[in-house]
UniProtKB/Swiss-Prot annotation:
EC supergroup of this enzyme: isomerase
Pathway named in the protein's UniProt entry: Amino-acid biosynthesis; L-lysine biosynthesis via DAP pathway; DL-2,6-diaminopimelate from LL-2,6-diaminopimelate: step 1/1
GO cellular component, one term: cytosol
Enzyme Commission number(s) of this protein: 5.1.1.7
PANTHER family: DIAMINOPIMELATE EPIMERASE, DIAMINOPIMELATE EPIMERASE, CHLOROPLASTIC
GO annotation terms (biological process): lysine biosynthetic process via diaminopimelate
Keywords from the named record: Amino-acid biosynthesis, Cytoplasm, Isomerase, Lysine biosynthesis
InterPro entries in the cross-refs: DAP_epimerase_AS (IPR018510), DAP_epimerase_DapF (IPR001653)
Official protein name in the record: Diaminopimelate epimerase
NCBIfam families: DapF (TIGR00652)
Lineage: Bacteria, Pseudomonadati, Pseudomonadota, Gammaproteobacteria, Pseudomonadales
Organism encoding this protein: Pseudomonas entomophila (strain L48)
TM annotation in the entry: none
Gene assigned in the entry: dapF
Function: Catalyzes the stereoinversion of LL-2,6-diaminopimelate (L,L-DAP) to meso-diaminopimelate (meso-DAP), a precursor of L-lysine and an essential component of the bacterial peptidoglycan.
Pfam families: DAP_epimerase
Amino acid sequence: MLLRFTKMHGLGNDFMVLDLVSQHAHIQPKHAKQWGDRNTGIGFDQLLIVEAPSNPDVDFRYRIFNADGSEVEQCGNGARCFARFVLDKRLTAKKRIRVETKGGIIELDVRNDGQVCVDMGPPRFVPADIPFIADEQALSYPLEVDGQVHQIAAVSMGNPHSVLRVDDVRTAPVHELGPKIEHHPRFPQRVNAGFIQVVDRHRANLRVWERGAGETQACGTGACAAAVAAIAQGWMDSPVTIDLPGGRLSIEWAGPGKPVLMTGPAVRVFEGQVRL
């Protein structure tokens, strides 16, 4: 059978989006791996699947597969593309949408200027919720990698993140240290590794090594986690502008227990069909 799909991106973080509300198919990890290959498939960082909700309190269910076939809890840039997609495809007329993910419920607000604001919910710092192995909760933790100790923050934005402060993201060892942090035994479900350079109280540069995808042009939940870690440790004040290789995101967070708001673009690239 042939399935219609849309290729989209949020700041260069690219996605294949499938409507499984009006189409019906059983998508497996092997399909994500096959289609995600940039040489022999469609090529993407993540596969986003739009499904009918399983409870009446939300509008849609949102599933995410990495290009390596692993299913993950959350994707912030993908959430913005999800919102744009369901409106463009007339799956809803609402501009404020409630969506269930493996990481919890998020709210998406499509603004008149085309930007999408995502209410990511409150960040979680309890180690067991991330999950991260630690004796007690702290703002930062020493993490030993190859005999060297790095001071990291650990945050869940519905998916696990580590945040390491660096002097300059351009020279940060993202490709050397990123995969080692991703697979560190203290992160039982692996982790997204962020490298943040604080420019001033409201601006920062960020690169992210994503779990199951490697370094991407942008990571929405990574930007949220980095902003939260920087605000919590007193390095920055909300609102925060995060510059990633693919572009800029605006992050707001009023403090513990409060939701993180992320605003940025969502762009449609092309439409296509793929054989299942």
